[in-house]
Amino acid sequence: MFCRKYVFQTWKQLSRSYSTVNSIGAAKTRNIGIIAHIDAGKTTTTERMIYYSGRTKRIGNVDEGDTVTDYLPSERERGITIQSAAITLPWNQHKINIIDTPGHADFTFEVIRSLRVLDGAVTILDAVAGVEAQTEKVWKQASALNLPKVVYVNKMDRPGAGFSRTVQEVIQKLETRVVLCNLPYFETNKESDLEFKGVIDVIHQKLLKWNETDANGNEISVVNIDETTPDLLQILEKSRESMVETLGEYDERIIDSFLEHDENYLKIPPMLLDQVIRKATIDNYLTPVFCGASFRNIGVQPLMDGITKYLPSPLETSLPQITKNGKDVTKKVDGEKGLVVANDNNLTLALAFKVMTHSTRGPMTFVRVYSGKLNAASNLINTRTGKKLLIRKLLVMHGDSPEEVKSISAGNIGVIPGYETDFQTGDTLVSSAVAKRNFTAKDSAYRLLPIDIPPPLFNAAIEPHTAGDEAYMKQCVETLIREDPSLKVHLDKEMGQVVLSGMGELHLDIVRERLVNDMKAKVNLKDVVVSYKESFVGKREKEAVITNEEIEVAVTLSHIEDARDYVGQEGALVIEEDNNVILLSETASSEHVRATIDERRWKCENNLEELKEAILNGCLTALQMGGPILGFPLHSTLVTVNRWNVPVEVAQEQALNLMNASRQAVQSLKDEKKDFSILEPIMSTKVYVDSNDLGEVSHDLTQRCKAMIVEIQDQSTQNLETAAWAKDEAAKVYVPPDYTIKKNVSKFDDIANKKIIVAETPLREMIGYLSKLRALTRGRATFDMTLIGMRRAVGNRVDSIVEEYKF
């Protein structure tokens, strides 16, 4: 046995100069996200990575509020991640761009927009809780983007930690093959309890044991596992056999090596194992698994090794979807330049995936450069606006600390500072790697796949203290919306209030805190309420005709079930967020308008497309102005423009008149309340409870929360109704027994004794549910919700909603 500083700490000096790190090529760059359920240890793990890379001289602590990545006052006060933070680290002659994402369901959009620009992900699991609800949700989001992943089983030092159980859940719940790159190592303490001390490196056949006297986790004892350590050797042999069997089914080189080495699993070279694991990970064939206890500084360095060894570089990841004028463009990967688009080595394409306003540095736009090189002191075009901008400076962020750089090359993440109103989340930016280039309209035709924005579910009204405070309040709200596109705003004209709409209670609480505490806006804050809708449910279609001098618009209102049925239909504007459709066919224009076009007598100051857009905008405005019951926005409604006419042979502007007429036509159809109903959001709710609490929680759901229980599932891995493949795969993987569970059985609740209550619940009844659930179960239960859709409220439900919105 010998003791030394961990070998990769010798590379720490490189981190002192970002210019050195920035010179690292795409092949040795890793863009990764840290994803997990809340409280799994994402930020704690990230802070250790920052320290071990040499970026900081001390380890940031969530409890002490001095973390690098959680730097917002609200984050440090609450001890949770709210905004995704970006940081660049050097490690093992590689560059790792890390984004530490939120774990709370209210900030799912932060996760979504971060995943879009990443090449891989580290999924952190709590070894006591196992695979939790938000983990499953984010895993599916990452899988939909074909992101390769590694798993890190954290908190192995906690009573009740179950590595074996957690691995089985990974296979069955996340439906992935695994290879266990390291295993937990325990020693018995004076109280005869097992304590987590280190990890068994299955690939290199070593025991890594962290020195308890070193508070920062730098000193690690490395022990060869051989005949002198028979117990460890037995575990290693079984683990190696399981690893080789899994890898052998993927790559024949493993089988060949096994036969060449006298069918000895331990003699297969680590280098070959690493190569095959890397290839299989990038192909999403399997997931490497690591373990540790980040708070005690155990296991983080091997995880960082795994990131550089197994996750892909920008040269190896799935190519982004890029279009030009709606058509796919050619893409190829150059070993030196990275992604080359449209056979143009100098074409630079970047995606603005996040916009924020810093308290002292002002506006900051986070970008992922996909092709070419984004240079400081160069021009770019925002393809959404067509506007040409001079980029003066570029930054790379380390949590809350920026470093100015001369360029951001393909495959990297950086920041454009300044430009308060010029960028929005999802913008495609076009530039050139060469200094001088004349941009044309063709350059504005490029589009990277936009970022989907989920619909908001909760509302909260705000009012300025005085009329003099209104302008600054609106300015602050506009800033928040640019930063967070999942936050919506509309004006309640009747009440004179600005209404914010967000993803959840916590989401809106944080927004309101930022308005008052960070931005110093003088506003009154109202309670968070559910976002309801209204829908036309009349038995017949209703038609209205608005005639104003020579302008005429005729529209019909009807109910629809699924707006997606109209996607691709000619003349259909589909608003998926509200399940609405506006149908404007080519034949809707009057014979007079069509004849004017054919005879070339058109004198109107607006062209045909501008007039059509005016009609659509007028109809859309009317839908958003709400229904006749309580003024909620309309939902599941089809507006059909049957005909329209304007005097296009007259030389004057008609778009505004046509838009107003369209709005009035739709508004006139909302005169009778009996033709409309209130829709409320219905959630698919999963409540995770101990068997002992099942009855009381179920009763509370059905009686107080007005829930309809769909089924009750067993949460233990032995009874999960998963695919036969996942069960077979779990049976093939060797994991050592969870001795910690057996030894400490009296110190924690049996996790295998948990149930899942699956129910459909009105969202309104789930406000504040977490605190009530914890009170019922003494803090042992959790829950997760996803939106099923909007459902018609009937009977007493309507009365309670109307009562809620009386002012």
Swiss-Prot record:
Which positions fall inside the tr-type G domain?
27-315
Q: Does the keyword Cytoplasm apply?
A: no
What is the originating organism of this protein?
A: Candida albicans (strain SC5314 / ATCC MYA-2876) (Yeast)
Q: Name one GO molecular function term.
A: GTP binding
Q: Where is the transit peptide?
A: 1-18
Recorded GO CC terms: mitochondrion
Under PROSITE patterns, the record lists: G_TR_1 (PS00301), G_TR_2 (PS51722)
Q: Name one GO biological process term.
A: mitochondrial translation
Q: Where is GTP bound in this sequence?
A: 36-43, 100-104, 154-157
Give the highest taxon in the source lineage.
Eukaryota
Q: Name one Pfam family in it.
A: EFG_III
Does Mitochondrion appear among the keywords? yes
Name the keywords, alphabetized: GTP-binding, Mitochondrion, Nucleotide-binding, Protein biosynthesis, Transit peptide
Q: Where in the cell is it found?
A: Mitochondrion
Function per UniProt: Mitochondrial GTPase that mediates the disassembly of ribosomes from messenger RNA at the termination of mitochondrial protein biosynthesis. Not involved in the GTP-dependent ribosomal translocation step during translation elongation.
UniProt family annotation: Belongs to the TRAFAC class translation factor GTPase superfamily. Classic translation factor GTPase family. EF-G/EF-2 subfamily.
Question: Would you tell me the protein name for this molecule?
Answer: Ribosome-releasing factor 2, mitochondrial
